[in-house]
């Protein structure tokens, strides 16, 4: 083979291979340090699928958190309903006691009437003032809607649960103890219906929450299987291309030394 001095063919080839090896080394270093195998052009299609799965997984997790907020609201409503029931118990006692008016003095009847009226005012205050995070829990004919689904194609899944029936308007007219026992019975009937709605709502939300948590975990696991770095494989690649880079650089030096032999002929 003739010696030519105008171009170092071997050195150029070796330099090119060294460049490729360094590129692959850098890619392996980035994948190992980031934990993401799809970067540096590793898998564009996988990145697209993985990102979509991860986004949906996180959305389902947030849906589960929304369900938890709904459960908290319903538990608050349950406590309010039970307190209303306690007031209804006392209201019924007052009504029954007031029925025995033949043995009550005028002052006794006045005391009973004042307590009954105060309970009526308290019930009205509870209806208006009972809130969860600023949202009214008890209002006439109110339905509470909990959005616990995920947005798919622009549609958000939701569930509407009637948490409270309208508490009887009779509470607005409680001015005395007479007949308060009948009003208490109406209140207790509403409380019973309300507690049934609450229990059903909590069961529904817990079921949806469990599904949302499970879906989130599986979607994020699927995304991880696509996008996460295979550390064993990538470490082997880093070692391989590190050796190739060192070998190529050594060959560049060897090729350059071979070219110097041409000059030796001229001396």
Q: Positions of the model-derived regions?
A:
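Surface-exposed loop/turn positions within long extracellular repeat scaffolds
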Residues: 106, 231-237
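Short aromatic-acidic-glycine turn motif
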Residues: 219
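Amphipathic alpha-helical coiled-coil/heptad-repeat segments
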Residues: 1-23, 27, 31-58, 64-216, ...
């Amino acid at each position: 083979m003739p010696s030519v001095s105008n171009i170092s063919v071997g050195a150029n080839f070796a330099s090119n291979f060294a460049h490729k090896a360094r590129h692959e080394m850098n890619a392996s270093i980035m994948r190992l340090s980031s934990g993401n195998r799809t970067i540096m052009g590793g898998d564009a299609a996988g990145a697209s699928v993985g990102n979509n799965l991860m986004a949906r997984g996180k959305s389902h997790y947030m849906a589960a958190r929304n369900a938890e907020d709904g459960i908290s609201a319903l538990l608050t409503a349950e406590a309010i309903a039970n307190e209303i029931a306690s007031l209804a118990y006392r209201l019924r006692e007052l009504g029954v006691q007031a029925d025995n008016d033949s043995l009550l003095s005028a002052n006794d009847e006045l005391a009973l009437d004042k307590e009954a009226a105060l309970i009526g005012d308290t019930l009205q205050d509870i209806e208006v003032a009972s809130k969860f995070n600023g949202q009214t829990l008890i209002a006439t004919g109110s339905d509470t809607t909990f959005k616990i689904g995920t947005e798919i194609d622009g549609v958000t899944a939701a569930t509407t649960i009637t948490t409270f029936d309208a508490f009887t308007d009779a509470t607005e007219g409680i001015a005395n103890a007479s007949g308060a026992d009948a009003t208490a019975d109406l209140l207790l009937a509403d409380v019973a219906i309300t507690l049934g709605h609450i229990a059903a709502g909590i069961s529904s939300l817990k079921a949806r929450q469990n599904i949302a948590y499970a879906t989130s975990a599986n979607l994020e696991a699927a995304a991880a299987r696509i996008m996460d770095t295979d550390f064993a494989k990538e470490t082997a690649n880093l070692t391989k291309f590190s050796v190739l880079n060192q070998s190529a650089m050594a060959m560049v030096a060897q090729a350059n030394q071979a070219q110097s032999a041409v000059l030796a002929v001229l001396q």
